[in-house]
């Protein structure tokens, strides 16, 4: 069976070297055959070993970093891990083995109060500039926060501090940004509280005319859901919806079947519903699954914060199965948030997790262990 793309993908303007790996419409140029074939008479499935690299507690991982509490977004840049820590208002930086590199990078608001940062995105293009003194550079990384702020960071400008570039509190609008992405020098922010996507250009001017309305009339997304994250994969934007806590609508609830994923064009026009409810449980992390690691070409990995599972979907949103642990049972990582594949050699998939009711933090990696047959 051939995997179909979700649409005709126009060439992207981003000079990002990862586009060839991120676009589900592109073929596996290395001609590596996947180990997982969910449509065959037998299933050969890869199992995965978990490497516990960093935690805020000595007993949980190989390395200890007290700043790693309630981590959310995680990215790999220049073969280094960059992790957003919600409870310590910081970005922490490690090599791929878990050794800490730069000092902790502060993400505080203007009055130095907590901002509770969440998502992080690498800026592959120009723009999103910050400056101090005589130094001005484009933002290397952008983060967002639950207090409705967006921060830009470049170590050349300041190696230990990010700069506030957007602050919705000033406008009087209550915004809770739980995720962000950058595409074609345009910034997209997922406002969980207001139930919409805020869009800005590279100079932080707000853009209008980006609807981001899920028009699936056969299965409308309930009003008590909000966009918990937005992910740029190829030439499409994927919005992950989570259910709001009825008591505190700033927060999402963990609940089986609580989640939707929608696909949009970069202009905010609706493409289709990717998947609804089912195995979703407060989803947040989503990445293209590397075929080189044994996943079906064009498939996706979606991490559930609610039950700690990572589920596999084909490019049409059909559920393939869970990622399996070494035991052959579904892999469970308590409080998993971000996912970051190592695009250089496809040997590992890194993750962040806010374990123990989000009072602890964990960063680790998944390494393919063996192949089992069903």
Curated annotation (Swiss-Prot):
Main location, first listed in the record: virion
Compartments where located: Virion
Keywords: Virion
Keyword Nuclease: no
CC annotations in GO: virion component
Record Gene3D superfamilies: TolB, C-terminal domain (2.120.10.30)
Family statement drawn from the similarity comment of this UniProt entry: Belongs to the mimivirus R640 family.
Protein known as: Uncharacterized protein L690
């Amino acid at each position: 069976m051939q995997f179909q793309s979700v649409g005709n993908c126009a060439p992207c303007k981003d000079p990002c070297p990862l586009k060839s790996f991120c676009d589900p419409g592109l073929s596996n140029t290395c001609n590596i055959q996947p180990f997982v074939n969910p449509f065959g008479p037998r299933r050969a499935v890869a199992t995965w070993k978990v490497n516990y690299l960093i935690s805020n507690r000595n007993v949980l991982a190989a390395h200890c970093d007290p700043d790693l509490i309630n981590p959310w977004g995680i990215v790999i840049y220049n073969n280094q891990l960059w992790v957003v820590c919600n409870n310590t208002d910081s970005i922490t930086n490690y090599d791929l083995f878990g050794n800490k590199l730069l000092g902790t990078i502060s993400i505080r608001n203007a009055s130095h109060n907590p901002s509770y940062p969440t998502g992080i995105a690498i800026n592959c293009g120009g723009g999103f500039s910050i400056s101090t003194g005589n130094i001005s550079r484009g933002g290397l990384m952008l983060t967002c926060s639950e207090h409705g702020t967006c921060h830009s960071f470049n170590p050349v400008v300041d190696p230990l501090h990010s700069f506030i570039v957007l602050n919705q509190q000033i406008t009087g609008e209550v915004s809770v940004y739980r995720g962000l992405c950058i595409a074609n020098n345009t910034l997209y922010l997922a406002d969980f509280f207001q139930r919409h996507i805020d869009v800005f250009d590279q100079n932080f001017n707000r853009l209008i005319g980006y609807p981001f309305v899920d028009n699936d009339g056969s299965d409308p997304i309930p009003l008590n859901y909000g966009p918990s994250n937005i992910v740029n994969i190829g030439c499409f934007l994927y919005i992950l919806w989570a259910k709001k806590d009825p008591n505190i609508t700033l927060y999402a609830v963990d609940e089986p079947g609580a989640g939707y994923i929608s696909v949009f064009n970069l202009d905010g026009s609706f493409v289709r519903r990717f998947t609804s409810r089912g195995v979703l449980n407060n989803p947040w992390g989503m990445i293209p699954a590397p075929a080189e690691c044994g996943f079906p070409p064009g498939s996706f990995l979606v991490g559930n914060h609610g039950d700690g599972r990572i589920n596999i979907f084909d490019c049409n949103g059909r559920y393939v199965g869970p990622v399996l642990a070494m035991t052959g049972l579904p892999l469970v990582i308590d409080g998993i948030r971000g996912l970051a594949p190592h695009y250089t050699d496809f040997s590992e998939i890194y993750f962040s997790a806010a374990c123990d009711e989000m009072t602890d933090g964990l960063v680790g990696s998944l390494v393919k262990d063996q192949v089992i047959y069903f």
